[in-house]
Amino acid sequence: MREIKDFLKDYEIYALREICEPFEIVEDGATFAANALIKARAVQAKLGELNLADEFIALSDDSGISVEALGGRPGIYSARFSDMNERGQITGNSATDASNRAKLIAELKALNLTSSPAFYTACIAVSSNLGDFTAHGFMHGTAINEERGSNGFGYDSLFIPKGFTSTLGELDDATKLKISHRSKGLELIKYVLKSLERKFGR
């Protein structure tokens, strides 16, 4: 949320809890785009129920890391990786950032690897009365089998962006904002927001 607000400073950004009571959204899509759209459409539908669909648009994102040595996993299951069994099924609801990182480290070590090419994907979705839109951003680099740095969340301490020697967990926020997959997706979605400005009286 902070990254979105920092990047879209020309817009008034509200968290869902500032508009209405948060509600559960089941993310059962097979791609980042599908899950991002599921969330944006669900929020837009709620805005319609509250007669706010002409005042707001819904923006959501779905993101994750794909590691080459793991066949692209965890991918869309990045937030639930440690709940995934050997058959690729999600069997629990106890995953944390720490447990997900531990699983990634363990799987790389099981392959006798200290690192692997990897990339982050972020899909930004917008849902409005004028339609639904998506934009993707990517950040390529290397996943490593030891944690370095504590500035961040998720897999930040295990990922070295291309062109850097430090992990995301070791980089400052300003640098990460410039290079992140989410920022790249948000840069593209700005074109969508700009095209919607007249509709919302900007």
Please annotate each region the language model reported.
Residues 1-202:
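Anionic-ligand binding patches
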